[in-house]
Regions:
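Hydrophobic, small-residue-rich alpha-helical packing segments that form membrane-like cores
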Residues: 3-6
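ALDH superfamily catalytic-core signature
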Residues: 8, 13, 20-174
Length: 174
């Protein structure tokens, strides 16, 4: 990124999405400062999705909620900064939501994204997989894993041991 930033001028705009640490490092680049380059940063977001009490199973709103949560969990392996990290559900609907999301996650196929039957690819690296596993274990100190498995993943068109694959995991905290 440094070589790209060395070429920016005052009429350019730099937009960054990622960690706050990296964003601050980029924003302090001499060219950004000296040329007064506008710098927009979206960092370390914690997005949520709230289900209303009237969005019960069988309603379009419930179906859209489940579809969006599944999509956010699986697009880019859930690793995009704007992904939903937390869902808030009325207590009376927790079981229904948990079951519906689990059913949708059961349909997710993991593997080589070049194959049309694959709906979720690998993470960036095995180090990232390990970090996610460690964070999930930390979260399970207060939340219960209700879907997924950190140690097993079924992969299509690739070797699960060679790639950075991790199945979607759903946690529940009452």
């Amino acid at each position: 990124a440094r070589s790209i930033l060395d070429a920016v001028e005052s009429q350019d705009v730099v937009t960054f999405t990622g960690s706050a640490v990296t964003g601050r490092m980029l924003k302090s680049h001499p060219r950004i400062i000296n040329e007064a380059v506008p710098f927009n940063m979206e960092a370390d977001s914690l997005n949520s999705c709230v289900l209303g009490e009237d969005a019960v199973p069988g309603t379009p709103e419930f179906d859209i909620f489940i579809k969006e949560v599944r999509k956010e969990m699986t697009v880019k392996c859930g690793q995009k900064c704007t992904a939903i990290r937390r869902i808030i559900v009325p207590e009376k609907l927790i079981e229904d939501v948990q079951i519906a999301i689990g059913q949708q996650l059961d349909k997710v196929t993991i593997g080589d994204p070049r194959l049309k039957e694959v709906s979720m690819g690998a993470m960036v690296s095995k180090d990232q997989v390990q970090e996610v596993k460690e964070r999930v274990v930390e979260l399970t100190k207060t939340a219960k894993m209700v879907h997924g498995n950190l140690d097993e993943v079924s992969v299509i068109g690739a070797n699960s041991k060679d790639g950075a694959f991790l199945a979607p995991v759903l946690l529940r905290e009452d």
